[in-house]
Amino acid sequence: MRKMNISKCLVGIAVLLAAPMIVLAQQTETHIGKVTGHEGAGRQLYFRYCWGCHGFRGNGNGENWIPTGSFPDSPYLNVEPRNFVAATFECRSTPTGTLPTDEDLYNSLVRGLVNSNMPSWVTLTTQNRADLVAFIKTFSARWKTEKAGTPITVPPEPALTVQSIQHGKELFTKLECWKCHGPEGLGDGPSASTLTDSNDEPIRPYNFSAGYRFKCGTSNHDLYKIFMTGLDGTPMPSFADVIKPDDAWDLVHYLRTLQVYHKSPELALWMGTKEGAEIVKAEKVRGTPTGSGVNQ
């Protein structure tokens, strides 16, 4: 009898000793290059830097959150913090409707989200950012049942030509981009005032004349990804099933010409044509609409 009790005690002690190892094994980890992010360390960082906007539970309603519409003339204050519970992310390299990769989340921390209150966290270490990614993924059950999508393939950018810009202009009309973004890309299309996000909150189309940076990056490569993956949670869809990959580059080239206040190879080439020069001149005369925002 005594031997049996001793055996039970030994088993109990073994279970207790193993418990921390079991908990540790259940911790979420991320892998960014050669760096492994850990949920526990990320939790401490989140409640130091992030919860004020994203909330104690990660649902995007922290004490610093400003309700949509509070400042109608400020596109920057009208961008809601990301709801990590919903796990719907705009900036991804993966197809629409899928979860982003760890690298996608990490890149958002490095880059920040342009035209929003989300800053770049480049001041943190690589390890810190990897840890934050690990903790952010604990808020939604989606990460337990779904895998991240497979990043889309971005073909090499073809040579910039007047023909590619002209074809992009035709696609802009054919795909009805103008209905939201307006014929000159000023964010004032006929549908602009009716747009809402996944929370049924008003959202503004991107105004190309307002700058050269996009929420998810600044390069042509970034713009291509936005067009082919869409911005989930917003009215901006993916056109991956509508347009050929190489043709998408033509649209990228044309969209750059709509950024009339930013010098770019695309704008310079377009200005060299009679049609392009007249269009750009007219856009500059018209100017940026008052209060036109860049939520998307």
Give the residues covered by each predicted segment.
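N-terminal secretory signal peptides that target proteins for export/translocation
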Residues: 1-7
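Bacterial N-terminal signal peptides
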Residues: 11-20
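His/Cys-centered metal/cofactor-coordination and adjacent catalytic loops
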Residues: 25-38, 52, 56-87, 143-161, ...
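Electrostatic cytochrome c docking/interface patches
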Residues: 25-46, 143-173, 262-271, 281-295
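Sequence/structural segment immediately N-terminal to covalent heme-attachment motifs in c-type
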Residues: 36-56, 160-186, 193-198, 251
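Short, non-ligating residues that shape and space the ligands of small metal-coordination modules
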Residues: 59-60, 186-187, 245
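Extracytoplasmic electron-transfer domains, predominantly the class I c-type cytochrome c fold
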Residues: 69-122, 129-132, 136, 194-240, ...
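Extended surface/linker regions that mediate inter-domain or inter-protein docking
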Residues: 121-169, 183, 254
